[in-house]
Amino acid sequence: MIKGLISPILSPFNEDLSFNQSLYNELAEDLLANGCAGLAPFGTTGEALSIGNEERIRALQGLIDSGIDPSIMIPGTGLCNITDTIKMSKHALDLGCHGIMTLPPFYFKGMSDEGLFNYFEKLIEGINHQSLKIYLYHLQYDLNF
């Protein structure tokens, strides 16, 4: 269990718009060195929806390769596409991440409770991982739920 502040990591990009992994690792290490107990890669300020799934997979692996313990990470895995959300979630859990943070469907506003339940049921069935812990990402002011 992670106790304490869990912070998203800013996602830095190079001039050519490619992902800057070395700076990403430095930012993560700086957050931990300055009191964060855990990290939420691809959280709010992490530009999750601006980064392709394969690039996110490489970035998460890059954090681990730099020496960051995956058990203190709860990466944002939610995307508009449930198939990519499942793939990213499985990858994070296979790496040993503490859990995953995901969004409810957000494109169409006013989804019914039954619709939300069905979405998360399909997501959980699709991930089908023994160490699955889902942290729901809920921004009241942004998602209008």
Where are the language model's segments positioned?
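Active-site beta->alpha loop and helix N-cap motifs at the rims of alpha/beta catalytic domains
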Residues: 1-7, 11-144
